[in-house]
């Protein structure tokens, strides 16, 4: 009898462990000096400081992990969840990465961000001990007249780049782009860029927190000192040519080795339900930009609302999203 009981118990325990999950995630917040209050007022985020510049919605990065906010794993970091349940929850397409591949954020730019650049993997691993950073931006909301910087107007030399930084004339050669709600930008590592004030951005990026500031409007940080610039490293990694206008992502809004992003729009009337499958190849990340409804998979259902971050583990099988939903769906390609 005891053997039968033990075998039954082991079988049930294994099934429980194997049962895939829909995780609602709680973010870490950042109070950078350019942030505002829109993520609190309009997206229900929690703020501990004077402002909320970013929320790291899907993150295993030590500088700001996201936390499981539902079920028996509530309170654990996403990294802890993955360590306990095994890398199979990420999918076979993630096996080529040594670490969790992506980081997703909401960004509230009440003021201009610094002019900056991110290194590629080779440079970042050698000099910073972490991955480089290719990213994409989806403009969730934009005040009238909002803009950002994306690459150069024309190709310049590294020498001219360095000289313009020194002479404070860099903005003259940067590509200033008017921005509207729904715009998408793909920012390859090495592309100089900056988010302007009055923008809410959803960002999908490599799992990295390496930024080289080039120009910061002479601002001081919370310590009263001018924020550090990283001129030498920035000159080394910057591609001094105009950013590529790359339409090869279609039908996705972004598609690269690190992430594939699709846009979902359920209006609640003509289109009020999406049905799909989460295979064993990749997890599915759902970042809800607007709306509310229910996500169901594998016998589990969770409600969602504007601002939520949902993680469906690889191998979850069939799922449905029902209701009103404006969202970014992120997977990892082969």
Q: Each predicted region: which residue ranges?
A:
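Loop-centered beta-sheet repeat module
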Residues: 164-210
């Amino acid at each position: 009898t005891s053997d039968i009981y033990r075998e039954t118990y082991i079988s049930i325990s294994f099934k429980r462990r194997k049962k895939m999950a829909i995780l609602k995630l709680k973010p870490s917040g950042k109070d950078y000096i350019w942030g505002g209050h829109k993520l609190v007022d309009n997206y229900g985020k929690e703020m501990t400081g004077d402002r909320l510049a970013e929320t790291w919605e899907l993150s295993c990065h030590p500088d700001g992990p996201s936390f499981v906010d539902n079920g028996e794993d509530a309170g654990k970091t996403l990294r802890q969840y993955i360590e306990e349940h095994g890398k199979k929850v990420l999918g076979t397409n993630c096996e080529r990465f040594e670490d969790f591949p992506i980081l997703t954020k909401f960004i509230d730019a009440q003021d201009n961000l610094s002019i900056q650049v991110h290194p590629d993997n080779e440079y970042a691993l050698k000099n910073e001990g972490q991955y480089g950073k290719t990213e994409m931006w989806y403009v969730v909301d934009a005040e009238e007249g909002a803009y950002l910087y994306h690459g150069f107007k024309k190709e310049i030399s590294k020498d001219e780049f360095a000289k313009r930084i020194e002479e404070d004339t860099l903005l003259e050669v940067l590509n200033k782009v008017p921005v509207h709600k729904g715009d998408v930008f793909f920012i390859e590592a090495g592309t100089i860029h900056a988010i302007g004030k009055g923008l809410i951005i959803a960002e999908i990026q490599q799992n990295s927190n390496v930024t080289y500031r080039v120009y910061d409007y002479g601002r001081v940080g919370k310590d009263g000192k001018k924020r550090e610039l990283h001129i030498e490293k920035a000159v080394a990694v910057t591609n001094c040519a105009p950013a590529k206008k790359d339409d090869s992502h279609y039908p996705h809004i972004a598609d690269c080795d690190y992430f594939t992003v699709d846009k979902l729009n359920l209006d609640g009337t003509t289109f009020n339900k999406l049905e799909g499958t989460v295979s064993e190849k990749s997890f599915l990340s759902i970042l809800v930009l607007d709306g509310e409804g229910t996500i169901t998979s594998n016998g589990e259902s969770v409600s969602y609302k504007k601002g939520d971050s949902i993680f469906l583990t690889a191998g979850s099988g069939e799922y449905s999203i029902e209701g009103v939903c404006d969202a970014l769906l992120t997977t990892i390609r082969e």
